[in-house]
Amino acid sequence: MAFLLIAILLGLIFIGIPIGFSLMLTAFFTMLIADIDIITIPIQMFSGTNKLVLLAIPLFIFMGELMGATKVADKIINLARALVGWMRGGLAHVNVVTSMFMAEMSGSAVADAAVMSKIFVPSMAKQGYAKPFAAAVTATSATLGIIIPPSIPMVLYGVTTNTSIKDLFLAGIVPGIILAAGFMITSYIFAVKEQYPTDTKFEPSNLGLAIKEALIPLLVPLVVVGGLIGGFVTPTEASALGVIMILIYGKFFDDSLSLTKIYELAVQTIRQTSIVMMIVAGSSILGQFLANEQLPQQIAEALMVVTDSYVLKLILINAFLLILGMFLHAAAAIIVVVPILLPVAVGMGIDPVHFGVIVCLNLGVGQQTPPVASVLLTVCSATGLGVGEVMNYAKWFIVSMIVTLMIVSFMPWTALLFL
């Protein structure tokens, strides 16, 4: 029955029903098929969303929206340009490094992609870069937003599995750096092949000036992530602190945030949060039912039948998560599937924190791969490019993501180094 419900969910998504409603309809089918008392559905929905730490999600989203409306992005881009703009394919590297910094402020790959696609794709095209290549770099580097802290998917993973969010944020640092390095290597190969130019000469004086101008914006992620890792604040308090700091900066340092603008951004945040929370509510019902059906035990037994090899089991789990990420929103995949796979992973000796990074990396690849491809489609929509022409370049960046995934999967120290 569990596999029937998963098939129903995927079928509803395929015919174009929004994933939040698809999850709700699947929950309704669950009630009919399993003869469950209807009152359990609202109870489980409330239970799945009635967690204080989930308040961090709208606050991190709001922080990203506020950041996009200020001049923070310009200062971060200038810093990235001074750091890596002198390399062959300079603007592509600037794009990646900027996404690393922006990931520390938004926690969302889609938010990063929406902002960066409007900035980098036109400017890279003007310097002679192929526009689809510029879009591919922008889309794939935005994935850093779900690995580098603060990461909204990691918050959801922590809530779902009762894993320390602080530890998850620490675990994302080294894999995030490896992932960014892979993107830069891929960009450099394309730059040499296509003879893309450098962006600027390296000047220590320019770097010093860029650091000085970006110092205040960079204090936001340092205080937010540093306070959380240091144990001074909870994830919810850290996200609220970040919002307050961005509001102060936008109002008093670059005068870019009026009350009207703040209201518009708040409304946009409410819309995005509503989508995420509907997914969380619907996923909690389906996830609970699948757990009650003892699906984790069934999967563990199936893996034992297929192979005794640890390596092959881990490859199969990664393959399953990769395919799942192509069809499901990250929030739904985490809430529905992680409670099923985590007992299997722990039984194999995988640390829950390490597994959280593996899950997020897999779902990051899924955000770039059709049919869902939420990040890729965001960039294509903003630039007017077709998915096919962007994928011609993006596929090589996706390969570098899979290489990073394999490194992190089979070298646990990359995720557990700071724990």
Per-range role (PLM):
Residues M1-L419:
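Alpha-helical transmembrane segments of multi-pass membrane transport proteins
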